[in-house]
Amino acid sequence: MNSERQGYELIDFGEGRKLERFGSITVDRPARGAWTPKAIPEAWESAELIYRGERMNASDGSWQVSSESGRNLDELMKGWECKTRGLNLQIIPQRTGQLGVFPEHWSLWDWYSRSIQEGITRGPVRVLHLFAYTGSSSLWMASHGAMVTHLDAMKHAVDWARVNAKLSGLEDKPIRWIVEDARRYAARELKRNSLYELVVLDPPSYGHGRNGEAWEIHRDLVSLMKDCWQLLSENAIGVVLTSHSLNISAKELRMELELATGKTNRIQTVVFPSFLEDCSGRRLECGEGIRFEPVGSMDH
């Protein structure tokens, strides 16, 4: 396989769908927010694996291969590898239309590596990564010197992340693999007086913890964010929150954190779009993120 055919590429998007290449396989699947016309209509003929459904998580959604591709659906459903920036990641089609990675998160990696390398000059950089899924960002941060606690409530996601670590030659990096509910674990870490320099979280709109605990972002995010902020050390880098469905503004969250700590004007927020750029230079919006950075030292 040629090296240029091993990575990720957003080829085109439009009419509610996106055309992507993961390694050697071209995939056509739904994309929320992709309602512009397609820029390269002829490119869609190259799709080999297609998710049939008007949206992700469709109850009637299913994967099919195009008749022209010559691909075998059963073989593709077993998975294949995609290389990106030194990492080898396992791609496995899910019944929800997901593939096990969120490429829009990779635009944060340069900021992670810079922040970690700057942080290491002051001491160890401990990262708590919540809702960490299959681990591409955990692996990126570990490969740049961080000690990472990778946590997800789904055992199969953590097992998948460990496979990605092995495929990437990073199984010996300082990564702790935890299957647990994010809120339960953060609260327990507070009781243990554990501290981290960086907390990263990508919560879903809805979900369930390891023991069936219900998660609803509009109900549970603020209390979790308060715990995350309290877990920061005196050498804190901050808290990074990404989501496809935030229902609260950066200003409101900052005010909640300041209220919880009893300190004002001590938190800086940076809002950034989460997006992918296609071959024509167009941006597909995929949500947004917020960085919460301490102003001055952290006092507990």
Give the location of each predicted region.
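S-adenosylmethionine
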Residues: 182-263
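Conserved alpha-helix/loop element of class I SAM-dependent methyltransferases that forms part
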Residues: 103-122
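Conserved SAM-binding motif I beta-strand of class I
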Residues: 147-152
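Non-catalytic substrate-recognition/targeting regions of SAM-dependent transferases
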Residues: 6-20, 27-103, 110
